[in-house]
Amino acid sequence: MPMSDKKRWIRLAVAAGLGAAAGAWTYQIQKDKKAKNDARLAVVEAAVVRSRDYGKQKAYIIGNSLSSLAAAVWLIKDCHFPGSSIMVYGENEEACGNAGLLVVSRENCEDFLELCGKLPGSGEKVFTFPKTEGGERLGCADLPALWRLLCTEEERLDVLSVEDWFSGTPHIFETDLWQLCQCVFGLKKDSNLAEFRRSLWELKGPFLFLSPEERQELIRLLKQYLRRKGVLLLENTQVTDLELENGNDNGSGTGLAVKKLYVKRRLQEEETDREAFVFEKIDLRSGDVCIMDNGSGSGKLWKKAADLHIALGEPEAFVGEEDKLQPLRPHHFTDRPKTVPTGSRNLGFVGAFSRLEEGCCLTGNYAVASARSAVDELMHAGRRAAGTEEKRQSRIRKWITVYKVVCSLYRADL
């Protein structure tokens, strides 16, 4: 190659490098400028929220699960809502899903960490729990089977069960990965293989397991914090029905609002050991909000509400044995109502049966994040939007993601 051509190519390479560096520098400047603008806007929005006068406005929260209690915390923290104007209606602990193992992912756990940071006596304690003992790591024979599964088209897996696929490597059913899938996704050996494959795409480790006792301790700290803030926790109380108003009859959901709540409260007659009940009708005024864990009370209230409007989801998709909701069916995504249904003026949903674009619906992260999403959108606090557009992956990115998923499962000691 002549010297002149070499010099020309060198000049072109240098120019290309300088152009790329200039482009990266410009992009970083714009990114920093946007971050500063966002920070300034956040400060202004926070000041506006702090200066609000809520007057006689009230918040009614249905259910005393982790997500319901978290909603009360976010009302106080993000919206500076007076605790004395918050009412939480709940049944017993088990009925509200507070009795089992709680799984926490370290990915996207900012909301969970921030919530725990608001509770005296929690904080680091929650994140120093040892991983549940008894499980084993993935073996060398398990990883190739997982790789083949992730690379197989889903349409070819519908007729197979998880046990069929791993019949040659039964060791996987003794690992922490399988325990995690049972806790987070409710999978069994005879579960559909395509559903198991979809679950693997959602796993981002590492995960921590909170025992039922540790979960109860977190719930206790939440209630203790809320009582100090003046929140009225009405236990042994059930919201049996609600009355909805739809300001637009064309089915779009515009103007959807809760107008009345019907409450049944249990009393105990000490002298006779008989149960007595008090029934109450609550009228919601303009500005009042209603936040519902639609899985509480076996989903009976959600079923009644869903019959009134299409925007409130399809609880029938989750009905299992004994006509009870099965929260361990996370992939009925479109059957879940958004944390704030389209057009809703004062109704929000939290918990495993509400819809967020990201996250495993049976983790502590999801419970806390759904509560924050519903509260901030209903109260226009601006902390976070309820959802984002789904991103499409190219074939190359898909293979890279497969590799990352398998590697993360192995590194997570699952």
Language-model segments: residues:
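Short hydrophobic core segments
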Residues: 62, 239, 282-295
